[in-house]
Amino acid sequence: MNEKSFNYDFSVIMPIYNVELYLTEAIESIINQTIGFENIQLILVNDDSPDKSEIICKEYAQKYPNNIVYAKKQNGGVSSARNYGLKYAEGRYIQFLDPDDLVSEGTFENVLNFFDEHKNEIDIVAIPIFFAEGRTGEHNLNNKFSSTRILDVEKEPHHILTHCCSTFIKKDALKNIRFDENCKIGEDAKLVNLIISQKKKYGLVKEAKYHYRVREDGSSAMQTAKANKNWFNHSLITFSKNLIDIIKNHEQKIPLFLQYMVMHDLKWKLLIKDISETPLDENEYSEFLTLIREVLSYIDDDVIIETKSVSHFYLYHALKIKHGENYSRYVYERETEQDYYLYREGKIVSKLSDQTLTIEILEENEDSIHIEGFWSSLFNSKGFKFYAKIGETKIKAKNIKRQHNDYISLGEVIKKYPGFSIDIPKGHLADNHHIEFFITKGKKRKLTKLRFFKYSGLSNDLYNTYVAKKDYIFYYNYKKLMFKKNNFKNRFIKEFRFLKSLHKSGEKSKKRKSAIKKALMARMVHHVFTIFNRKPVWLFIDRQDKADDNAEHLFKYAINKNDGVKKYFIIKKDSKDYDRIKKYGKVIPYRSFRHKILTLSSSKVISTHADIWVVNPFFNMEIYFRDLFNFEFIFLQHGITMADHSEWLNKYNKNIKLLVTSAKPEYRSIVKGNYNYKKENILLGGFPRYDNLKKSEGEKQLLIMPTWRKDIVLPKDQAKGVRPYNPKFKDSEYFSRYNALINDERLIEFAKKNNYKITFFPHPDIQQQIVDFEKHDYVEFADYNSSYQMLFNSSNIMITDFSSVAFDFAYEKKPVIYYQYEKSYHFKLDYYDYKKMGFGDVLENHNSLVDKVIYYMKNNSRMEDKYRKRVDNFFAYTDKNNRNRIYNAILELDNNKVAK
């Protein structure tokens, strides 16, 4: 099988650094190749790894002395390690396998067969990439693997190759090419494309698989790129510019395939909003912008515009950066007798008659039909107007500013979303059966197409969708929003047609068949349930697995009201709070079939959280039930809003009917902010749980309660509501700071002498890491299921950082200390200033923090007067009547009123 000049068919070079958790699996995937391990040389290059990788390497090298070479070198980075490994390579073909990835068993056999068949045509073969661990699915560049074939990059330049690990390279092709050790990001794409540039072709082997591990600890290079300073100017210089310079020496023009590849990397940099999203200083950021402009100058306009996986708004902004003052000569708008057009270099790219309006909200009020949405287009939005037409009546749309939807690139607002609102009096519906929407510019007016988002109740992705409101049923037909009277006959016909369409689509798609079968069953059960249940249903939920927050406190209050409303609390059945709440109220297991049916039948969903899992227990099956999500969402909040969360909590993303606030400045910041709610949607009522806060009595206690940090925890499992353990958490400053605090002997000794207990209770999103902390005998670690209320009521002093629990604690005028050793947190504050508005000292130093705690212990845990005054000025109510205010406000929603 082997040629005379080579001892192996393949040499696999594996650069190793800090991968002991994954290394064995990677090595075994090579050993188990169907081609036979005797035909493979495995070169393990230890780049001075500090973990136990060396032990694993030596064990395998000893077990397979004829196949495995182990080499150790001084740390120099992945390119250095790969180049070092090439010195030992004795195979015909080279693969650079990352030690946390895998290859499918038949990969080498399939690749060898392909090389044997096409050995003189190509120097490199690529295989498709599939994600593993932290992400599922396949790489978005896999679309070129329609078949096993040779790809000619001059004929298909848009099919780019950016990953060297999923390629196999002829050793002879690497004689004069090495990885650029000065290039820290993009070094593999650089090498691969320099090789491709020789023959302008490469092979594709569809049958093989490269399993790319996206680590759950967030440490894959792809995941951490933007946090790395090298991702900015360094990569533009050593990767993009240098690659262009090398090719310029050999070719008159940069080949299209290389332009596409460079633009593929550059497009992610266009998503940077401004300097605040970078680790750069002002001079470095200025250079960053200059480098982007310089690289774009080598990329054809068509290549820029045809770049995939990024909005056209960013791509046209790239054209604007490239052409500067001359941009208007390349991209411009013109009106003709037929239409209004957008041109790029003389070619029509958009026209007024081809525009689409998106309807996001469709509501039926007492006297009108209320419609809200937006228009997204490459046209400059200035001068465009919208109106609805019903019969012969035209109703102008009101413009709505939607700053949270603005597209921002590199410090410039590149696209504003024109939002609109239309109220159609019900009197116009009597003699008509459809509504049309028009867009105008100058003298031109054109009928628009329609697209629907979730709060409309309709969908463009399913046939025969409809939504039944109080008096009317709405559906659509291409460019018309249709309606008819809501009666049993019309509802039955629309539902029958929708279910029939669903059933047909399920028969055509095996992938969707199971989901559609469940949807059909759930919809039928829902319709039967509504026949027998005429009472309104309210659902209350805190977290999936924990109660004891605002929703439970309000639930406990509301169930004692004789108002004809059925009230249920939603929580996981294995939660410790499930049986406790069941003793006094009705409890439904989270995501149980009954929970799902009740969601479809509910009039109110009331929660301390606004995440998708609160309002949608169906998760990705939501599309089949969109028309039945008719409940009003009441957001009680978990903590007081200090930052601008309008990008997340805005009306079009969450559609909150009543958002409860507790503080005067908080209320003002939301009413006047970019949330797009009306004043009556925001209630200044106080948190329900505040009604049960008490002054501490009996034992004295110091409560240490820091919040979480998104950069030190792993992504949350939305279904389970938990985060997996992060082995790198102990490397964080957060860990070292709080571990030192809860083991500080000076603090502990003084607490002992003065009879103060010390309790440590970090945020629930840190609880999976609690095992990492060193536990002092005197310090109690509060259980995850501990009652917040009991902890607040039994404590005298609190240490926190940025957490909103400080508000609960200070509400009873107990002393709070803010331990803020960082310069910034993971959100930007809106109106709130800790030093000017906080209820205690803001400290950065460990010793100063301990001094302040001791001061309070010496002074009977009394909050200073200046902070007591701040409490009085901040909170709207301290009368223990918050639950009543909120309960009455929810009742009055049905009358479109909010209790003042």
Swiss-Prot record:
Pathway: Cell wall biogenesis; poly(glucopyranosyl N-acetylgalactosamine 1-phosphate) teichoic acid biosynthesis. It comes from the Bacteria. The gene is ggaB. Keywords: Cell wall biogenesis/degradation, Glycosyltransferase, Teichoic acid biosynthesis, Transferase. The keyword Cell wall biogenesis/degradation applies. GO terms for biological process: cell wall organization; teichoic acid biosynthetic process. GO terms for cellular component: membrane. This is Minor teichoic acid biosynthesis protein GgaB. InterPro entries: Glycerophosphate_synth, Glyco_trans_2-like, Nucleotide-diphossugar_trans, TagF_C. Belongs to the glycosyltransferase 2 family. Involved in the biosynthesis of galactosamine-containing minor teichoic acid, a non-essential cell wall polymer in B.subtilis 168. GO terms for molecular function: CDP-glycerol glycerophosphotransferase activity; glycosyltransferase activity; hexosyltransferase activity.
